[in-house]
């Protein structure tokens, strides 16, 4: 089973590349961002809490995210070829918890880290904010999200690097060139 953690700063192109990977490899796509936005839209108490955290540029607490992931893994179809984790794990504690969840299921994952220059990330997110209407795509919140990413999520890369499950991807390139890098790595992993 091919399990991929698609990492990178907000706006690095994780969602776009996830779609391309799903199309080519037939994997299940778990976008935690989509799952969290759906919870917010539901109007539940949890959704309200999550909405306030996200609007402020903060991460959702680990225990809530881990519960969401465990529920997702428990409901995978029997013929599942693998999962793309888009937006998870975002902390080392989440990475450790994910590793345990996967080990219990005799699975493992690799991290594909999409690096994009900060100026390019800001430009992409501001442009996305104009068309998406997402409250978290404004300059102040973007800067805070990038600070949170550097402080809390970037260490996840080191965690996977030490486990030899880390691959760096240059996300500054075109969508096609970036996918070509990813595709080459995935073909090597599957051999």
Regions found by a protein language model. Give the residues of each.
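Glycine-rich phosphate-binding loop of ATP-dependent small-molecule kinases
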Residues: 1-191
